[in-house]
């Protein structure tokens, strides 16, 4: 494509001229390697952006595609690339016969330097030299002659307008110029030489290397002399910045390179040139372009200052000013914010304001700080500001240090590097650089147990008094936080600390035993909530004699609680009616109450938690003459049971049960005095606004596993109730996971175990021996748990037997078909959520218990036959039986079977009202003949007494063995006189067998918790759940 064709392709003269300017000013980069290739890539610098133009070539013609937003086939960038490609193609095909060159005759010729500069082309520095030839007799427009080559006789120049070759005898030039021209010829043959009009462009690194190795004197000289009083030129005021990185001293140009007119020498300041060769830019630029000139100028200026130059001046259209009058001064600070855990830098510039003779402060990242009225008094040097700030950010490598906001500092040298960077930074008057004190100064830690002077305890808190030299609480917390994150240093507000120092290790070892989340301080005192009293006393006793720290009443309280010593005011006959462990439980409850604590009574099912609470309440009301009511929150099925227990053991206390219509309950609440109010979970939820208007003496929640879900409305309602003493009753404080325990404590001792996230991070996620030990140690003073095996030696044995049965062939086939169909459906679902998997498991468990096909129920069920065999044998031996199942239709199926076989039975499930449930239990316990109680596992597992039963059958295996055990213990409890036989009927080669295997595998972890059984299946991953089918 010719120039004329390119002009036509551009369509408009304006577009062609713009493209021509891009091409002529060196803003188009097209590597020579693409010249003879079928496809290639060019880059165009356009308005500070790099535009990429891809092209395919065929027969010298280009088809281009541009990355710009214009999205046209003939944009200005494509036109510029076509011009560049045309030039390179013409030059590659051009060949000249040197013997036919047009000879220019003269007596003497000389090189006239037209311009000198450095240009950055495609990421590398090039030396640019433009020169013309001056002839004393004939001068054919020297500006259009370009150096072509040179030999020992002639210098050849190419006429750019008519593509003709001209020659001049080499001998006509002075010796230095002859050597220079021969040197140019050598460079042109060794390197890829670029041309810009009549200028030569050489790669700077190669150019300097060859020049320094050259032995012949040329017009090039190296000069490291320092020149003072340098004047920098600023051409155009409207640009608000430097647009020429060039200096003058007198009449001498002081650029990166300088041309001495008189001596006809080009002076290269090699020290600066070598410094600048390290810079790499991803695009083609010219250093005289404004947006790149200022950053480049700053690096040049800072180098001069480091090399000892002092006085600099700037020239505008109407004046010459000193550097400080023209350039703004940077104030740059790097600091670490220990509260936000952030490394931050702040920078601002101060400009001389010529309008009001003052200064204007400008924040680069907060432009609004520069007042609009000040704009007439100074000009912002935006790119200069950016260059200066980036320079100092690079010096401190802030990107490297900011990674420590997320990663631990594991070597103190990593923090010492800040001070090293500041020390290595040579000060210049262009900037004032500083670091925050906490990055510069290391401070030794002081720790001594002797600093603890006294401990005082009141109704709400513990006061620890320390000597003035002791470490403050805020710093202790910060040190522990840094330590737990894996840091070996701790950065405080004013200094940093080495955590590997002996004193720091001792401090961490000591204070790491405390829970300081709720601790406060006022100088030399640290305050802890009172519920940490026993833990604090135990820790201090390892190091000091606590009798020298606590007052006598406090020491007695600690010893009494540890030894469970409490003087009850109950009559001797009443208290002696309780078993010894129950008396201990009453004392324990009263001790917690007197010390303003709360607690969890977690005795195993069947040990009489209800009666212990009743006697504690009775003793408290009699001894303290309490005028407030107390509140007991229970499942609906236990309302009447609690009422009857109060009537039996404490008839002198008035009891109100909120099992009346809602319209009447409001009046009941208003008239409460020193009475006991018993409400169900549901009534509490609906009447929470009315109930929370009252303050209670005791607030007791029975079956406290009902508030394990902290987001449920019942849990939220329970935690709103105001009471002097809060107590939770549960046989399974940890039913599913450790968070169950947290929720109970959040009711009885709010904040004691931190918030939910803190507890999860510390205990739930870790699940290590150390975390379990810490949890048990912290909670043990406030949990009382006894098991039947330890306190009831006279209680008969509970014998558990697992009976494995094989499904008959038809049943097994039905099971496997359902299993395979379900797994295939899960496989097809993209979202393999645990819900889909658990649904399949539930179906299979149900199918094991009650085989159904399209025709109805299959009568020949191996599990049913095994259960009936046990039941028939028990009835023959005059024994009552409880059969637990999860499925209502299994209960109905057995009901029909018992009718046919004439077996007496009772049904106890969620379909029965609380009142009728109480009646059913009494009928079953009082029945004279052997009979069967068909009970749903959940309904039968809460608050009932079934000691008449001697045989317990679990027809379908439950996820959570804690729930199974809880149901079993309704028969195996106080009052049981005979051995209880427990049977679990398990179908082999089914999901039931796999569930039992996984439960057994978890026993090691279970043994470390507060209860015998934990429902691990709720925490299994989808992959672990799917492995149950293997």
Curated annotation (Swiss-Prot):
Motif (DEAQ box): 702-705
Domain Helicase C-terminal, residue spans: 867-1021
GO molecular function terms noted in the UniProt entry: ATP binding; helicase activity; hydrolase activity; zinc ion binding
Pfam family, one: SWIM
Highest taxon of the lineage: Bacteria
Entry's family note: Belongs to the SNF2/RAD54 helicase family.
Record protein name field: Uncharacterized ATP-dependent helicase MPN_020
Source species of the chain: Mycoplasma pneumoniae (strain ATCC 29342 / M129 / Subtype 1)
